[in-house]
From Swiss-Prot:
Subunit annotation: Homodimer.
Record-given protein name: Iron-sulfur flavoprotein MJ1083
Organism: Methanocaldococcus jannaschii (strain ATCC 43067 / DSM 2661 / JAL-1 / JCM 10045 / NBRC 100440) (Methanococcus jannaschii)
Known role: Redox-active protein probably involved in electron transport.
Coiled-coil residue spans: none
Molecular function terms, GO-annotated: 4 iron, 4 sulfur cluster binding; metal ion binding; oxidoreductase activity
Cofactor section: FMN; [4Fe-4S] cluster
Phylogenetic placement of the source organism: Archaea, Methanobacteriati, Methanobacteriota, Methanomada group, Methanococci
Parts of the chain that traverse the membrane: none
Cofactor binding notes: Binds 1 FMN per subunit. Binds 1 [4Fe-4S] cluster per subunit.
Length: 193
């Protein structure tokens, strides 16, 4: 069993990275292998709408996206994290989401467990709408969407932070990220029985 966590932040060591890693640590404590991927240091290019992925099952753009999609396909669970950008995901994560179209052919992510993390500059700073965008992505890929586990049990990991490292002091954000990891681990184990 394996879960990958992808931070869509342009900052390699920002608050989104911190919360995605927090969720992955909770998953690892449940005996599941984890891998962290930061999009900050990846070469990512936008979809150009050429439809080659529909014809050939693979995107013709040569960058780091293909390797990430391969890891998503091989994983049992996927956590996607993003800072809030105008109520939605970062450009980096949106490029990965848009370029995942080859995996939708044949629904290659079907029944994988998906969880979301979002970090905003204030407590009600668009985290839930950003998570909703990630959940929509999971649903379109026919994945199983989970939120954070009890006792918080909402949409996913929701952090507050402006400067890198601020989330270290966000007890609620850390708790929701850990609870998300526990829920992803729980459902992955149920599916893999």
């Amino acid at each position: 069993m394996k879960v990958i966590g992808i931070s869509g932040s342009p900052r390699p060591e920002g608050n989104t990275t911190l919360l995605v890693r927090e969720a992955l640590n909770a998953i690892a404590e449940e005996g599941i292998e984890t891998e962290f991927i930061s999009l900050a240091d990846k070469e990512l290019n936008p979809c150009i709408g050429c439809n080659m992925c529909k014809e050939e099952g693979k995107c013709p753009i040569i960058d780091d996206v293909d390797e990430i999609l391969k890891k998503m396909k091989e994983a049992d669970g996927i956590i996607l994290g993003s800072p809030v950008y105008f109520g939605g995901v970062s450009a980096q994560l949106k490029m990965l989401m848009d370029r995942s179209r080859p995996l939708r052919i044949g629904f290659q992510l079907r029944n994988k467990v998906g969880g979301a993390v979002a970090v905003g500059a204030s407590r009600n700073g668009g985290q839930e709408t950003t998570i909703q965008q990630i959940h929509n992505f999971f649903l379109i890929h026919s994945m199983i969407v989970v939120g954070d586990n009890d006792p918080t049990a909402h949409y996913g990991g929701t952090g507050v932070g402006k400067a890198p490292g601020d989330c270290k002091n966000d007890d609620i954000g850390l708790e929701t990220a850990r609870n998300l990891g526990k829920k992803v681990a729980e459902v992955v184990k149920l599916i893999k029985k």
